[in-house]
Amino acid sequence: MDATLMVKSRIGSIRWSVTASIAAVAAAVAYVPAVRAQPGLQGSWQTLSTQMPINPIHAALMNNGLVLIVSGSGNVAANTNFQAAVWDPQAGTVTTQPVGWDMFCNGMVVLPDGRPLVNGGTLAYDPFHGEVRSAVFDPVSSTFTDIQSMKHGRWYPTVTTLGDGRVLTFSGLTETGATNTAVEIYTPGTGWSPEYAAGWTPPLYPRLHVLPNGNVFYSGSGTGSRTFNPTTHTWSAVIANTNYSGTRTYGSSVLLPLRPSSGYTPRVMIFGGGNPATASTEIIDLSQSPPHWQYGPPMSQSRIEMNATILPNGKVLATGGSLNDEDAATASFNADLYDPATNSFSSAGANAYARLYHSNSLLLPDGTVALFGGNPQRGTYEARIEIYSPAYLFNADGSAAQRPVITDVTAGPLAYGAGFQVTTPDASTIASVVLVRAGAPTHAFDMDQRLVELSYSIGAGVLNVTAPPNGNIAPPGYYLLFVWNAAGVPSVAPFVQLASSAPDQPPTASITSPSTDVTVSAGDSVFFEGTGSDPDGTVTAYSWSFPGGNPDSSSVASPGHVMYSTPGTYTASLTVTDDGGLSSPPSTVTITVTDGDISLTVSPSVMTNGGWVGHSANVMLVVQ
């Protein structure tokens, strides 16, 4: 049955109306920081009266401003009352509902249409076996619907939205308890692809990020980094190794802000992890050739089972975790704020309660961050919710800063590269416009997290903004749109939707001359000409190959005459490449080169002894 928690305000008293069993609350003692927080410098922390009635293991921010919480069995093996909930941060309510199977330890992202996708879960405990099932949640009707099952189960999978709106899933334990080493790709409305074997064994919940070139980058928790090509369905060899010698188990990974001013250079940062944990961080610039990991600044505390949340100003908030796994005695209460511009950490104050295994942090539309959960021991969890209000919401004296206001946004979905308008009376003061992907964190990782800065110009009471150029920069779906004023204060963010785009279609090559296979004599030449076409773009490159010919290659559409000197059979080919980087299948023609000598056989019909017979032959030599 449903359980509803009612509050008068965000920090007001709670009136309980509970008809379902509530999980036990962990008896954690509140941490009291030694130094009083300074809101204008560090931000501030508060604990809500609202509490989580189920173990909040998985969370997803939906485009109606509500947060889907998924618990399943809640890390209690004997619990068959599988649960989910919807939290309304503004109203202060949490409404629970049953789910049809155990979604504990799934992978979850929000589809481009706004529906959360739950992928896999728990088939059996100790040892764990993975579910083959997946489901989508409708934010309007608040119902789950099962979709096509995967080929094999996944417990602890990672799911990632690709640049065309499809969803990739990788790793997890199968229905037999083995590591699932295959990639599957889900197309909304169609179903799952065949399995694509990886050829290597990933960790559980691998850290994956979609890059601006469309490939998927694996950053850990293992030491060797790789990329996956969604077009060829293949993994690269290891392209870089981390400096930290151990695995960063339950550390976090963040794709740092993508900005047009830097050509959307992709940089990934990994935080903490390991047991005992490390405080170290590392950063890789994937525009370098070859890319390599470099140590970043250390956090103030070592963290395993931590959280890392990107804020709308591009800084990254690191919270929770502990030195030793699932150990409240070594919990990390300090909150650290990483600034990519200065490559340094500063203090974001301290939260009050240990946030360990199964804790989560989530950016909300008002620019605050919710910190909740923690489940170091089965049968108990931390039910209290904390809210971090960053320093950008305060003046230097600690009073509330005046925020810019967005009154309207062009109705979506927005097309890539298209212009749209943001109406604001504060247009003349705006210094930055950014999109932040609606979050979906679990197990120390937000699977689709990213921030993309937008180009814009200022008009009379409006901002003329340009959407990201393509889905690899910002995959289709819902984003929080923040505007920032010159004082560094953000607006409250409305949701905007980037339209799903069809997958890039490959171009087609055609050899027009010769139009059929040809036979020539050694020393002759053949005239070549070709064309290329692309159904959703333009052809940008031609590549000819002429085995046995001179020249043996060309990069123009019509290379002209190619000389063949050696007898044999050769296959000439043309391949074209489009503006999306996709190449066509080759167009081919066979060239048969014969010996150039002429042989005549004379067979007269009448011959007399001692007589002479005269014959004549006409030989025509055609030189092309």
Where are these regions (language model features)?
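Kelch-like beta-propeller repeat domains
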Residues: 35-502
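Proline-centered linker/hinge motifs at extracellular inter-domain junctions
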Residues: 404, 503-508, 598
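Short, solvent-exposed loop/linker segments at the N-terminal edge
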Residues: 412-416, 517-524, 606-617
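A short beta-strand segment in extracellular, disulfide-stabilized domains
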Residues: 419-421, 522-533, 616-622
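Extracellular acidic, Ser/Thr/Pro-rich low-complexity tracts
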Residues: 424-429, 532-536, 578, 621-624
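Short, solvent-exposed loop/turn segments at the edges of extracellular beta-sandwich modules
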Residues: 486-488, 577-582
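Residue-level signature of extracellular beta-strand-rich folds
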Residues: 511-514, 528-533, 543-544, 559, ...
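Surface-exposed, flexible coil segments in extracellular/virion-facing regions
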Residues: 543-561
